[in-house]
Amino acid sequence: MRKIDIFDTTLRDGEQSAGINLNTAEKIEIAKQLERLGVTIIEAGFPASSPGDFDAVHRIAETVKNSVVTGLARCIQKDIDTTWEAIKGAQQPHIHIFLATSPIHMEYKLKKSPEQVIEQAVEAVKYAKKYFPLVQWSAEDAFRSDREFLVRIMNEVVTAGATTINVPDTVGYASPYEYGALFKYLLENVKGADKVKFSAHCHDDLGMATANTLAAIENGAAQVEGTINGIGERAGNVALEEIAVALHIRKDYYQVETGIQLQEIKRTSQLVSKLTNVVIQPNKAIVGRNAFAHESGIHQDGVLKNPETYEIISPALIGEGEIPLVLGKHSGRAAFRDRAETLGFDLSDEKLNKAFVEFKKLADRKKEITEEDLLTLLTEQQIQLEDVPLFELKMVQVQYGTENIPTATAIVLTPEGLEKTVVATGAGSVEAIFNTLEQLVPNAVHVIDYRVTSVGKGRDALGEAVVNIRYDHVSTTGRNSSQDVLEASAKAYLNAINRHLIKESLRAHPV
């Protein structure tokens, strides 16, 4: 059966979504989960774009062992050099270089003739091959490019040593029939097409990314690129979970396999949603909250008699199911460590100890500790960066009443090691807390977005607060969870400030 490689670009193309801002620890955590999911290639970032991206790609390349790690680069020698420095520690060094090929891009963006574009692409591939055994070349905006020109330039880059040719529908303009036909044409006309892999990369501007990707597979694509939950610029990329499940459920038709561990899909989706702060729409295919819900009485009756009457996908297939009671307040450190490892967390002793302390606090207050609670608690510990002095909330107290002005008092340990007490009022309890904590930093903090969601069910569920701020003209998002939503809100606000400090430290001391 033909094998389709899954190329995940959640950490590169996905992170280009408006409002997404991942730090290195979060990217590493997502990369490790993508490895557990079984993706063939992880595009970890664009190393030449910033010190932060370089650091993330470098560390992911050294961490991930069972998936190929790649970095994006323009067809520029400096970009390729930087990507090699970031990727060279990987098991199989891989680079993804790109150059636009559509008339509108060549004329207005590149300001180059078709011949100059071919020359630049060939030189870049030859240069990259000096470092990398695996070189993927992308024809940016391929679908809107002239077909004959695509054949010309692809002939040259294949001869130069490219091992994969990517054919992106960069602006999501294609229809399934047209996109499939383009693959058929290229595979029939590019010299040496049988010696390289052709890859599909679809955007969802017209809502056809999944259909277009499947059409490419039907017409010979050997690799598909996309993101978890379909995140990405504008309307997003193709959702890889949709492709993986569609190819599995309709294996009778497509006759291909992916190597994806389908039972890891739900956990991967939840992790990406949590760390990117992008909420999954309830009716999202495969991973939405309502994906397996039946409201109609006729449907419910049928499912009760035989689930296959209305369910073509078993919830268990993607790791969906009842969240069991896993630990309680009498559970010991060894059991906690074992459960953390079962859930896929490889925490340092220090982080495990901190997580265990938080677990015991929660267990004393909460009747039942669910797997979802543990995932939230362990994720928060795993993504903490400890190499930069940060603010730490020691205490927060709010005085509130319908006839009183809300007043917040906080005691905070500053990055300099000083304990500082701050007080402020606000129109409500949350604003009072934010106004109080804003006094800790020299410049104004603008809260762009704030929300609290429930983790799990019941009146004793954890509340997860997410705060998106703009400070020094830079947007940063913080998060925290607690049974007390005011405490969670205060810690989320400080988490956003701390993430800004980490960014500034990295900018001042690049890797």
Swiss-Prot record:
Keywords, sorted A to Z: Amino-acid biosynthesis, Branched-chain amino acid biosynthesis, Cytoplasm, Leucine biosynthesis, Manganese, Metal-binding, Transferase
Q: What class of enzyme is it?
A: transferase
Cross-referenced PANTHER family, in alphabetical order? Answer: 2-ISOPROPYLMALATE SYNTHASE 1, CHLOROPLASTIC-RELATED (PTHR10277:SF9), HOMOCITRATE SYNTHASE-RELATED (PTHR10277)
> Under the cellular component aspect of Gene Ontology, which terms does the record hold?
cytoplasm
- Supply the CDD domains for this chain: DRE_TIM_IPMS (cd07940)
* The gene coding this protein: leuA
What PROSITE patterns does this protein map onto? AIPM_HOMOCIT_SYNTH_1, AIPM_HOMOCIT_SYNTH_2, PYR_CT
**The keyword Cytoplasm belongs to this UniProt entry's keyword annotation:** yes
Query: Which InterPro entries does the record associate with it?
Result: 2-IPM_HCS-like, 2-isopropylmalate_synth_dimer, AIPM/Hcit_synth_CS, Aldolase_TIM, LeuA/HCS_post-cat, LeuA_allosteric_dom_sf, LeuA_bact_synth, PYR_CT
**Positions of the UniProt region annotated as Regulatory domain:** 392-511
Q: What does this protein do?
A: Catalyzes the condensation of the acetyl group of acetyl-CoA with 3-methyl-2-oxobutanoate (2-ketoisovalerate) to form 3-carboxy-3-hydroxy-4-methylpentanoate (2-isopropylmalate).
Q: What pathway or pathways are given for this protein in its record?
A: Amino-acid biosynthesis; L-leucine biosynthesis; L-leucine from 3-methyl-2-oxobutanoate: step 1/4
Which HAMAP family does this chain map to?
A: LeuA_type1
Task: Summarize subunit and interaction data from the UniProt record for this chain.
Answer: Homodimer.
Q: Which cofactor does it need?
A: Mn(2+)
**Cellular location(s):** Cytoplasm
Q: Name one GO biological process term.
A: L-leucine biosynthetic process
Protein source organism: Lysinibacillus sphaericus (strain C3-41)
Binding of Mn(2+) occurs at: 13, 201, 203, 237
What is the reaction catalyzed?
3-methyl-2-oxobutanoate + acetyl-CoA + H2O = (2S)-2-isopropylmalate + CoA + H(+)
Identify the EC number(s): 2.3.3.13
UniProt record similarity statement = Belongs to the alpha-IPM synthase/homocitrate synthase family. LeuA type 1 subfamily.
Protein's name in the database: 2-isopropylmalate synthase
Residues in domain Pyruvate carboxyltransferase?
Answer: 4-266
